Design a protein with these regions (language model features):
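N-terminal amphipathic/basic-hydrophobic helices that include classical n-h-c signal peptides
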Residues: 1-16
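Structured beta-strand/loop patches that form or line metal/cofactor-binding pockets in enzymes
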Residues: 14-59, 351-356
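Conserved, mostly hydrophobic/aromatic
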Residues: 19, 57, 74, 114, ...
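Metal- or metallocofactor-binding catalytic centers and their adjacent structured scaffolds
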Residues: 52-125
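Glycine- and other small-residue-rich loops at beta-strand/loop junctions that grip anionic moieties
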Residues: 63, 111, 179-183, 209-210, ...
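Shared catalytic-loop signature of beta/alpha-barrel
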Residues: 72, 222, 228, 239-256, ...
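Metal-dependent enolase-superfamily TIM-barrel catalytic cores that perform enediolate-based chemistry
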Residues: 135, 140-251
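Extended hydrophobic packing segments that form well-structured cores
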Residues: 373-391
Length: 391
C-alpha cells in the first residue's frame, strides 16, 4: 500500500486519538488429558491478553506472557500517547528495558503484547488489515503444519498413531512431534512408528525443546536420518550457539530454532553465523510485529527460511498470519513451494479452549493452508465474555 493511500485512510478516521486505558487478562483453561514434552508436563493452558483502548473507544488486542510488567512498567509509558506512533512507542518501551538487558524473557513478551495491540489499533483506525499496513500481501493463504503428538499417558502406540492419521485425514501435509522426553531408543521407536503410520509423502518434523546437548542431539539425529525428517527443532539449549553449529554440521536434516530468542540483537549471531537452516521467531515473545518484521528481513538476507513458531490464542495466530503473508520466498523461485522456499507456519492442534473460544470464529485450515484475515487490524472478533470467563 502506498504512503499516500495510507495517509488518506487514516485521515478519514482516528489519527489524533490517545491511549486511555490498558487492561490485561491472564487466561487459563484446564486440560482433560495432560500432556508433556522434554521440559515439562501440563494440565492447563495459559496466556496473557492485553487490550488497549483509546479516548474515542477504539480497542486493540495483543498477546504475550506477562501482565505485571505491562501493568507497572510498560503500560504506563503509553497512556496519553497516539497509538499510531508505533515505531516510536516500540523504541520508548524498548529503551525502558535496555539498560539492564531486560528485553529478554518475560519483559520481551510484555513488549510484544503491547506492540501487537498497537498494530491492531492502527489497522482499525485506518480500516485496513495489518498485512496491508506492512506493505501488502504476497499470499492470501499461508501453508501450515499440525503441531501435536506430544507425550501423554498410555499414548503409544495406538493413541499417538491415531492422532497422526487424523491430521492426514484433516488435510495436513506436515506434522511435528516431540523428542527428548524419553530414552533415545524409545523416542526413535516412536518417530519410526509415526513415519510408518503417515507414509513417506507427509512432511515429518521433530522438536526436542532444548532437551539435548550437542553430542546426544547428533546421536539421535543419526538414528533418525533415514526417515526423511524435514527439520530437527531446538535440539540444544537456545543460547548455545556453538552447539547449534556443531549439530548443524553433523546432521543431514535442516536444523531449526529461535522461538526462545528475543529481539534482533539475540537473533543476530545465529543468523550471521548460519546456526539455523530455519528460524522460528515467536511473535508474542520476540518483540511483536514491529521487531519480528526486522528479524525476518535479517533472516531472508542470510538465506535462512522463516517458519514462525505459534502456540497461543487467536490473537497471535492472526498477527503471525498477517506478517507471514508479507514474507518473500527464500530464495525467490518461479514456483515457490512450502518447506522449500515458501514459509510454513505452525498450527497448534493440542487441546486449548483459549485457542478455540476466545475468537468468535476459530481459525481453521483447508488442505494445509490457513487464510489470512481480511478485516481491519488483526481481522478477528474477540469474545470478551470468554476472555473474562477464563481470566
Amino acid at each position: 500500500m502506498s504512503e499516500v493511500l495510507f495517509r488518506e485512510a487514516v485521515t478519514r478516521g482516528n489519527t489524533r486519538m490517545k491511549i486511555a486505558t490498558i487492561e490485561t487478562f491472564d487466561l487459563t483453561c484446564p486440560l482433560n488429558r495432560p500432556f508433556g514434552w522434554s521440559q515439562g508436563w501440563i494440565d492447563q493452558r495459559g496466556t496473557t491478553l492485553v487490550k488497549i483502548t483509546t479516548d474515542n473507544g477504539l480497542a486493540g488486542w495483543g498477546e504475550g506472557a506477562e501482565s505485571s510488567i505491562i501493568n507497572h512498567l510498560l503500560g504506563p509509558l503509553l497512556i496519553g500517547a497516539n497509538p499510531m506512533d508505533r515505531a516510536g512507542l516500540w523504541e520508548h518501551m524498548f529503551h525502558a528495558l535496555y539498560n539492564g538487558n531486560n528485553a529478554v524473557g518475560l519483559a520481551g513478551s510484555a513488549l510484544s503484547a503491547l506492540d501487537i495491540a498497537l498494530w491492531d489499533l492502527a489497522g482499525k483506525a485506518a480500516n485496513l488489515p495489518i498485512c496491508t499496513l506492512l506493505g501488502g500481501k504476497i499470499r492470501d493463504k499461508v501453508a501450515v503444519y499440525a503441531t501435536g503428538l506430544y507425550y501423554t499417558e498410555g499414548e503409544f502406540p495406538d493413541r499417538l498413531l491415531d492422532e497422526a492419521r487424523s491430521y492426514v485425514e484433516q488435510g495436513f501435509t506436515g506434522m511435528k512431534t516431540k523428542v527428548g522426553g524419553l530414552s533415545i531408543e524409545e523416542d526413535v521407536a516412536r518417530v519410526k512408528a509415526l513415519r510408518d503410520a503417515i507414509g513417506p509423502d507427509v512432511s515429518l518434523m521433530i522438536d526436542a525443546n532444548e532437551g539435548y546437548n550437542a553430542t546426544t542431539a547428533i546421536r539421535i539425529g543419526k538414528k533418525l536420518q533415514d526417515l526423511d525428517l524435514v527439520w530437527f527443532e531446538e535440539p540444544v539449549n537456545a543460547q548455545d550457539l556453538e552447539a547449534y553449529l556443531e549439530v548443524k554440521a553433523a546432521l543431514p536434516m535442516a536444523i531449526a530454532g529461535g522461538e526462545n530468542l528475543r529481539t534482533r540483537y539475540e537473533f543476530k549471531p545465529y543468523l550471521a553465523r548460519r546456526a539455523y537452516d530455519i528460524v522460528q521467531p515467536d511473535i508474542m515473545h520476540c518483540g511483536g510485529l514491529t521487531e519480528m518484521a526486522r528479524i525476518c528481513a535479517l533472516a531472508n538476507a542470510c538465506g535462512i527460511q522463516v517458519n514462525p513458531h505459534v502456540w497461543g490464542s487467536p490473537v497471535m495466530i492472526a498477527a503471525t498470519l498477517h506478517l507471514t503473508a508479507t514474507l518473500p520466498p527464500c530464495p525467490p523461485a518461479r514456483n515457490a513451494q512450502p518447506y522449500l522456499q515458501e514459509p510454513v507456519m505452525e498450527f497448534d492442534r493440542t487441546p486449548s479452549a483459549i485457542r478455540d473460544e476466545v475468537c468468535a470464529v476459530p481459525f481453521d485450515q483447508v488442505d494445509s493452508f490457513a487464510k489470512v484475515p481480511q478485516g481491519a487490524g488483526l481481522g478477528i472478533e474477540i469474545d470478551e465474555e470468554a476472555v473474562r470467563r477464563m481470566s
